[in-house]
């Protein structure tokens, strides 16, 4: 059979979402299956077989698989970074302890702040003599004997995951490579990451932590990707059986090695990266740090693609899950990027889509603060035991319980697969209401109001920090709980409207199929604009472009299918932060450098409200050069929807729903709605993986692509 179906598989903490796209027709098929945190490969393969069974196809029909995984993220968020060691310069053993000497926002009095545990305790930090100057020249030679001694120290104590970060190795990596060679000789079973390969950028604290995060997640990610790659290879040739039953393992893997990842396979397998691109499994195992936010990145990209097709180039996205809500901003069809992200308590300076996360998901717990006020989140009931209405042992009221009590979601989820216990949810809300002195309805409505404001604050944060006005944006909501508070957010934020895509609960999996192969490269090269030599800048970009080209060649992209994008980090001399600006194509000349400086002034004003263009004393300083290498993949177009026959044909009845009061709300099956159909609230639009409560005074119109466009009525 000709391979014509591409699959996107997004593994979340609760569900694994799968989207299948036929490359010729653009037809979509979607499904969900419970995730299997103890062995994520089981849920992955079960979901894959489920969608293929729906289509009546076998593995020989699959042309490629793109995957978003939480393996790396979960290891960090759960604090599972044990058995990790660190090697740095002699005299810098307290680099991680000192960190940035800063206290997080919200702790005005530092006496109340408890410093979190460092990623590596100081007793597992070893130092080696040897020192490079800021320009890469050698001040003291690398001490091979001491390096050997330290490698044996790690080996004798069974510390087999090690990060190496030496000062100024972003300029000259010879000392770090020498340390890796010593570790390979003396401790051959160790997994090693060196900072000059993970992050070739200055600021040693962030570079060290990013390198250690890379090392910490590398063993798990390698084993996981190797297992999936082996199963996909078997599937492609018809040797793989059905999805493994729960509790079983899909096959053996070898710690620290990835033979099945590196081997040739008839089925291309890509893994989503945090920067908005994908990378083949064989390459991504050497860049595990790049996958830490792959799930939220895929959702933001999928939302950007759907919004662009619908005619919206500027949107904010809201991905509502069970534990949290992720928001980001899309300008001119591109999600915003950052290198200032954090994963849990750990700074990660690799490029990633800028996502703000707030603990306001469907499972977020409502509670009474010591001050007597109602709070929602960040603590969550998660999937186990889950909200009270799941009847799995949960006793604390959650956002989902409030929705159930107010009739805003049906008494079942996933098309009836998950029945909900409305009475138990009401009991949990009643208990909280009695503490607050409120009625059940007022308490449940209050829980949703607090949750809506938590989400609104995150949306303001992601826009205002960039000098943007959230009122200029349309919001795209997706995820299982993403659309539940859409109408309230329109009022709170003054939004123009909301776009609810087709299959919103599977949009992250769809987003996996809309992206290209992408690698990012950086080189710190600090110089003031007045002394900047175009030849030096040209040489720097040429070296980065060569590295990007080599990586694309390994991915199988010929020279005529490689795209390169240049950017630079600039600042005013004396500042401690940079602004990234695009560097146009073409020869690096004085004129081009001047145009980049002009763009920096404009961007600085947009972000901070001022620039120093007219003040010659405020000199522009170049800090880092960046190149992104992009290999375009075939991506699906957004299919158009069939014309509807009127919203009444999709009506399934009515029920009492509480908005500002109890009202009769019409119910609609979204599968039966077509382009041009329009619904006026109060109403509830239900589908397999999501629900949209449409408040009184709002309309929802189905556009040409099947999206629901929600706006407040003109009157």
Region spans (language model):
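C-terminal, non-catalytic interaction/recognition modules in large multi-subunit enzymes and RNPs
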Residues: 3, 11, 145-149, 153-156, ...
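N-terminal glycine/serine-rich phosphate-binding loop of ATP-dependent small-molecule kinases
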Residues: 1-84, 140-162, 176-181, 185-195, ...
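Short beta-strand-loop/turn "lid" adjacent to the catalytic site in phosphate-handling enzymes
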Residues: 20, 28-32, 59-102, 167-176, ...
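Glycine-rich beta-strand-to-loop/alpha-helix junction loops that act as flexible
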Residues: 69, 163-167, 195-197, 274-275, ...
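Glycine-rich phosphate-binding loop of actin/hexokinase-like ATP-binding domains
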Residues: 31-37, 85-91, 281-407, 487-527
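Charge-patterned, long linear interaction tracts outside catalytic cores
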Residues: 232, 266-309, 546-587
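Terminal amphipathic helices with adjacent charged low-complexity linkers/tails
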Residues: 163-211, 215, 583-585, 622-645, ...
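Conserved phosphate-binding loops in N-terminal lobes of ATP-dependent enzymes
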Residues: 8-11, 15-19, 27-30, 34-43, ...
């Amino acid at each position: 059979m000709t391979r014509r179906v591409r699959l996107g598989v997004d593994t979340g903490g609760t569900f694994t979402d799968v989207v299948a796209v036929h490359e010729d027709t653009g037809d979509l098929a979607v499904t969900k299956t419970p995730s299997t945190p103890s062995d994520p490969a089981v849920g992955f393969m079960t979901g894959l077989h489920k969608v293929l069974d729906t289509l009546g196809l076998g593995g020989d029909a699959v042309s490629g698989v793109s995957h978003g995984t939480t393996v790396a993220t979960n290891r960090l968020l759960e604090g599972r970074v044990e058995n990790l060691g660190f090697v740095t310069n002699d005299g810098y053993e307290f680099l991680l302890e000192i960190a940035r000497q800063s206290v997080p926002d919200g702790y005005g009095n530092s006496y109340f702040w408890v410093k979190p545990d460092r990623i590596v305790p100081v007793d597992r930090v070893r130092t080696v003599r040897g020192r490079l100057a800021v320009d890469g020249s050698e001040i003291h030679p690398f001490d091979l004997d001491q390096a050997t001694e330290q490698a044996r120290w790690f080996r004798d104590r069974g510390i087999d995951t090690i990060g190496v970060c030496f000062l100024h190795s972003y300029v000259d990596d010879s000392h770090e490579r020498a340390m890796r060679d010593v570790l390979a000789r003396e401790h051959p079973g160790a997994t090693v990451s060196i900072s000059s390969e993970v992050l070739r950028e200055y600021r040693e604290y962030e570079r060290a932590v990013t390198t250690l995060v890379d090392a910490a997640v590398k063993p798990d990610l390698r084993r996981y990707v190797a297992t999936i790659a082996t199963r996909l290879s078997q599937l492609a040739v018809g040797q793989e059986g059905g999805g493994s039953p729960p509790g079983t393992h899909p096959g053996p893997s070898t710690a620290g090695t990835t033979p099945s990842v590196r081997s040739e396979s008839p089925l291309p397998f890509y893994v989503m990266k945090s920067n908005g691109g994908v990378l083949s499994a064989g390459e991504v195992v050497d860049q595990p740090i790049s996958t830490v936010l792959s799930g939220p990145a895929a959702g933001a990209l999928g939302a950007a693609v759907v919004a662009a097709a619908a005619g919206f180039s500027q949107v904010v996205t809201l991905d509502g899950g069970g534990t949290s809500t992720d928001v980001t901003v899309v300008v001119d069809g591109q999600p915003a990027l950052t290198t200032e992200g954090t994963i849990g308590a750990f700074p990660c300076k690799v490029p990633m889509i800028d996502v703000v996360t707030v603990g306001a998901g469907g499972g977020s717990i409502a509670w009474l603060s010591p001050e007597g006020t109602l709070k929602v989140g960040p603590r969550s009931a998660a999937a186990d035991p889950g909200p009270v209405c799941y009847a799995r042992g949960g006793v604390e009221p959650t956002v989902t319980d409030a929705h159930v009590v107010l009739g805003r979601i049906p008494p079942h989820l996933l098309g009836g697969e998950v029945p909900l216990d409305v009475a138990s949810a009401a009991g949990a809300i009643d208990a909280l209401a009695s503490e607050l002195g409120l009625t059940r309805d007022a308490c449940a409505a209050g829980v949703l109001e607090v949750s809506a404001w938590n989400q609104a604050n995150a949306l303001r944060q992601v826009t205002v920090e960039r000098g943007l006005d959230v009122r200029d944006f349309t919001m795209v909501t997706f995820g299982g709980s993403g659309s539940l508070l859409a109408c309230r957010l329109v009022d709170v934020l003054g939004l123009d409207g909301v776009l609810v895509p087709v299959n919103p609960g599977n949009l992250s999996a769809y987003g996996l199929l809309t992206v290209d192969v992408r690698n990012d490269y950086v080189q710190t090269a600090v110089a003031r604009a007045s002394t900047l030599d175009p030849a030096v800048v040209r040489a720097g970009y040429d070296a980065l472009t060569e590295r990007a080209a080599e990586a694309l060649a390994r991915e199988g992209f010929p020279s005529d299918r490689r795209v390169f994008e240049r950017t630079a980090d600039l600042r005013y001399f004396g500042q401690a932060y940079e602004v990234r600006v695009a560097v146009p194509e073409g020869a690096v000349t004085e004129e081009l450098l001047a145009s980049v400086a002009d763009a920096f002034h404009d961007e600085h004003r947009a972000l901070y409200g001022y620039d120093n263009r007219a003040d010659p004393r405020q000199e522009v300083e170049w800090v880092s050069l960046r190149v992104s290498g992009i290999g375009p993949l075939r991506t699906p177009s957004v299919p158009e929807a069939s014309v509807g026959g009127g919203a009444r044909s999709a009506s399934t009845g009515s029920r009492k729903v509480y908005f500002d009061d109890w009202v009769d709300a019409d119910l609609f099956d979204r599968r039966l709605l077509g382009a041009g159909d329009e619904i006026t609230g109060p109403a509830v639009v239900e589908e397999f993986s999501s629900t949209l409560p449409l408040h009184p005074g709002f309309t929802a119109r189905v556009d040409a692509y099947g999206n629901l466009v929600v706006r407040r009525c003109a009157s």
